[in-house]
């Protein structure tokens, strides 16, 4: 008999229909129900008495539009929906996020449970329409954790996986580039270039082979708590809600997933992870996280320009001396070139646009000669952790733990975080299986073993050894001072010093008044190497359902005038997707009206991080919405 996994079912009929299917076919009546009989989507829809969603809008290179609903009205209406009872699905382990960390944890739990002859049900909730659709990285992957998790992975590697052949390092000025030594931490012998989106899809398929249940288009939007304050699970957001927060004809309440342990693997600055960190004061003994914004494109280039396996990084232009960042260009697969720029979000100048800095960076001959004659296929942007050792929060709390970039394990010196994220998932999984062996797991688990054991792995050792590199760029010497200190650290000190440098204290606070700077006149795109933001965002395949609540909450209505006058529209500059803009409005006291084009959001989280007033709040939109990355 043929079977359809729950993950495939969710993809076939849409997330909102799975609740009804599970309810009517028979939800978790027993632990053996890991697969459902194979049927056509239409048959399954008859079972659930639902209809497929038809309300998507695809963003192209077109004029932006936005709805304007009063935040108070929307909040009041959504609050009323919270009184409606949710369907509850009881599982053993709930993982929020089907990225490398979450999937590694899921696979490891299944592996270790099988060895111990236990049945542990693992459910992974993913807000994207498919695993990998929201995954963005360079990516050059160090296979340390992958070798541990799946020792034979090279026999069936991810698509376009390419062994690194050689490294390059360049210092750029506007029209020239100069070779500089490759630091030891950035030498990539034994590593692999690949698309993180493709890698994540591949890893998700491996997880399903182990019996992991992956539910794509399930956007976890709320953490659920017991009466004693411990985490009992999460709830997904509601379907069929209009822009005013009122139920539509196809309304369906979100689903609750209860578990003795919930792992948060949302990636950098996840919305639920942010709330967990605040509620349990997990940053009480560490510094605030600092972030970078990575903006990238994937190109296909002519044979004569292509050097398969080459990994290149750049310093210098277009970054100013007070702005941390650098470029990269990786060549992999079938003539694919991934080119990008990471800009530290602690930059002070509100006129800086990371997305436009990236576009003009490609005009440097170092990049232009490779991209010439090629075709830009995809565009992506995502915030990444740069705080390192100093910014790691407490990882555990009653009923759950933070893993991967939800905690922040990126090694800035290596420009890598996938291997450390995966290792954190592996260590958390081992702690969970051990806890299930000691306990019936009928109550929330406290995974203290996970945190203690992770501190004894290469994850913490790596981050400790390079802890001073990123904050060294904060001195009055700026990037030049940071590069000099980093060279001494890399070749001489190697982290063996009695001091630990500090970060600035938050990226939002680093933003200075526009009065201290001159506006930046970025060159117009040539539509050959450089492109405008609407064209770029169209290459992210971003989709959002029409007539749903705006997932970007602006809590600053009384402060918008002062914010604009002080920072001159910084929101429009830091957003890489054209979500925020100030349009002329004679009726306004300052001649402008703040507009949120939420349908263009690529889920990078920059607004929630960089807004100087910390009044913009990013929340999960309807499940399955957002970008549809395939090669990023």
Swiss-Prot record:
<dbReference type="GO" id="GO:0051539">
    <property type="term" value="F:4 iron, 4 sulfur cluster binding"/>
</dbReference>
<keyword id="KW-0999">Mitochondrion inner membrane</keyword>
<protein>
    <recommendedName>
        <fullName>Probable electron transfer flavoprotein-ubiquinone oxidoreductase, mitochondrial</fullName>
        <ecNumber>1.5.5.1</ecNumber>
    </recommendedName>
</protein>
<dbReference type="GO" id="GO:0046872">
    <property type="term" value="F:metal ion binding"/>
</dbReference>
<comment type="similarity">
    <text>Belongs to the ETF-QO/FixC family.</text>
</comment>
<dbReference type="InterPro" id="IPR006076">
    <property type="entry name" value="FAD-dep_OxRdtase"/>
</dbReference>
<dbReference type="GO" id="GO:0004174">
    <property type="term" value="F:electron-transferring-flavoprotein dehydrogenase activity"/>
</dbReference>
<dbReference type="InterPro" id="IPR007859">
    <property type="entry name" value="ETF-QO/FixX_C"/>
</dbReference>
<feature type="domain" description="4Fe-4S ferredoxin-type">
    <location>
        <begin position="592"/>
        <end position="621"/>
    </location>
</feature>
<keyword id="KW-0496">Mitochondrion</keyword>
<keyword id="KW-0411">Iron-sulfur</keyword>
<dbReference type="GO" id="GO:0005743">
    <property type="term" value="C:mitochondrial inner membrane"/>
</dbReference>
<dbReference type="Pfam" id="PF01266">
    <property type="entry name" value="DAO"/>
</dbReference>
<keyword id="KW-0830">Ubiquinone</keyword>
<dbReference type="GO" id="GO:0022900">
    <property type="term" value="P:electron transport chain"/>
</dbReference>
<dbReference type="InterPro" id="IPR040156">
    <property type="entry name" value="ETF-QO"/>
</dbReference>
<keyword id="KW-0249">Electron transport</keyword>
<keyword id="KW-0813">Transport</keyword>
<feature type="binding site">
    <location>
        <position position="601"/>
    </location>
    <ligand>
        <name>[4Fe-4S] cluster</name>
    </ligand>
</feature>
<dbReference type="Pfam" id="PF05187">
    <property type="entry name" value="Fer4_ETF_QO"/>
</dbReference>
<dbReference type="InterPro" id="IPR017896">
    <property type="entry name" value="4Fe4S_Fe-S-bd"/>
</dbReference>
<keyword id="KW-0285">Flavoprotein</keyword>
<feature type="binding site">
    <location>
        <position position="607"/>
    </location>
    <ligand>
        <name>[4Fe-4S] cluster</name>
    </ligand>
</feature>
<comment type="function">
    <text>Accepts electrons from ETF and reduces ubiquinone.</text>
</comment>
<feature type="binding site">
    <location>
        <position position="575"/>
    </location>
    <ligand>
        <name>[4Fe-4S] cluster</name>
    </ligand>
</feature>
<dbReference type="InterPro" id="IPR049398">
    <property type="entry name" value="ETF-QO/FixC_UQ-bd"/>
</dbReference>
<keyword id="KW-0479">Metal-binding</keyword>
<dbReference type="Pfam" id="PF21162">
    <property type="entry name" value="ETFQO_UQ-bd"/>
</dbReference>
<dbReference type="InterPro" id="IPR036188">
    <property type="entry name" value="FAD/NAD-bd_sf"/>
</dbReference>
<feature type="binding site">
    <location>
        <begin position="93"/>
        <end position="107"/>
    </location>
    <ligand>
        <name>FAD</name>
    </ligand>
</feature>
<keyword id="KW-0274">FAD</keyword>
<keyword id="KW-0472">Membrane</keyword>
<feature type="binding site">
    <location>
        <position position="604"/>
    </location>
    <ligand>
        <name>[4Fe-4S] cluster</name>
    </ligand>
</feature>
<keyword id="KW-0560">Oxidoreductase</keyword>
<keyword id="KW-0408">Iron</keyword>
<keyword id="KW-0004">4Fe-4S</keyword>
<keyword id="KW-0809">Transit peptide</keyword>
